Amino acid sequence: MKNQNSTNSFIRIENSYLFSIQNVLKNKLREKYVRSLIVLGSFLCLSSSSLLANNVVIGTPTVVGGNLQFTIQWDNSWNTALGPGNYDAVWVFVKRQVCGGTQTWNHSLLSTVSGNHSVTGGVLQVDAVSDGVGVFIRRSAAGNGNIASSIVTLNLQTAANLVDNFQVFGVEMVYIPTGNFIIGDGSSQYTFNGTTITAATQAAGFANANAYQSSGHGSFGALPAAYPQGYNAFYCMKYEVSQEQYVKYLNSLTFTQQIARTNISPASATGSWPIQTASPNNARNGIRIMTPGTATTTPAIYGCDLNVNGTFNEAADGQNVACNWLSWPDLMTYLDWSGLRPMTEMEYEKVARGSGVPLVANEYVWGNTTILQATSGALTNGGQGAEVSTASGNGICAYGSANSTTFGPLRCGFAAGAATTRVQAGASYYGVMDMSGNVFEQCVGGYNFNYSSFNGLNGDGTITAAGLFNTANWPTAGGGQAGGIARGGSFNSGAPGELRLSDRNQMTNNFNQSKQSVVGGRGVRIP
């Protein structure tokens, strides 16, 4: 439930201010995507209601004059001109199901002209994007606080009607501004060599790997100007993909697509474990089949059941726990479907370290070398939206858990509270959570592979009928030696070294080519 007594404050963080996204980072419900909000044709209309997604609430969509209209509200929004000079936003996109069709949810393109969309209240603005895959909704001027319910009207490229079904999804993002920054700390394993990324390096590219890694441990091919070094502005997901977020995605796929993204047939019995099959609740993944599908015609319906009692989507069923067991193809397909894309290693370091920030040798994402262990074996309110570690202090990070089926990742953003600083919350310079520990991030990069063709093309919202991403020039297999390195460490990282911001010790490891208990991820998008 929403906390109606939230307060807002700014937190001093070295040379910057990070807005304390109080209840966004508090002990509260943390669903990452809006639950399926469906408006049905008049002769099919059953019932619908507004549903909570993290602190973002999107009301039931309705069709008004060929446009799609719904309400949006969220807590603790910010837009600050002070360092780091960024803001939060909600990435909103729409899926459409033709009434009486094949149950396929297709991506619905939106107008590419911002003026064709609107939002009431005078506080927010709608930013269209050039490919029409979605829109960003954000504050239009400097300020902070809760966003009251506002009516959003989206103009679809194909007019909405009263017989089709619509789902509106929203995910919290953080704007990462244009600016210089440093890659590498000169100390961590296989680190980049301390190069400063500037407008000039972005425009010129890198002739070879020795230009950014002293031992040449990078791309076989020269990195051209089109390769995203991180200098230019982009948006980054505030949190790692959550288990409920992944469930909502699976529930929007066809039966055939579900086969590709799970380990067992969607027609398997109720209670089957589709993401991992070794044992129930393996490494705290609580995704199960709630309603079996029918081969080739009707997809399964998945749900969360972390406490393994057979009742789905209860308060303690781990909906807000970071989703693990995501292979490179799993994450890439999810990002393509969402209209996002993978980040590069260099962008990862930009998000974590910040722009114009002095280098700290062996630093973690929160900007210093202090680290405090948190594990899923010592929790309060385990599995709930209020899940927190019993440990508290500076540099708290989910790492060091035993390699067993009972330990796993924690709730997304578990370390942040109403009055935590960046160091206490384990937050990045820009306010992005859990970039060290919890689950490995998956980034374009690594070693012994030519990933120079990656040009940062965003996903288009559409995946193949076989259930695979198909955006041009994305590395296909993943793995440190196939263009998709794992960064940031995980709940199972034994030594804190691989949790360091600039550590690249997984550059030769291809373990994320298949589902692993320690791997998850998040996406980014160019504006």
Name these PLM-found stretches.
Residues 36-48:
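Bacterial N-terminal signal peptides
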Residues 1-33:
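N-terminal secretory signal peptides that target proteins for export/translocation
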Residues 103-141:
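Solvent-exposed serine/threonine-rich low-complexity stretches and specific carbohydrate-binding patches
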Residues 129-170, 195-363, 367-371, 381-433:
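Short aromatic-cysteine micro-motif
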Residues 71-84:
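Short amphipathic, basic-aromatic surface patches that mediate peripheral association
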Residues 321-322, 413-428, 458-527:
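Disulfide-stabilized, aromatic/cysteine-rich ligand-recognition loop
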Residues 49-53:
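Sec/Tat signal peptide C-region and signal peptidase I cleavage site
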Residues 82-92:
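Short coil-to-beta strand junction motifs in C2/discoidin
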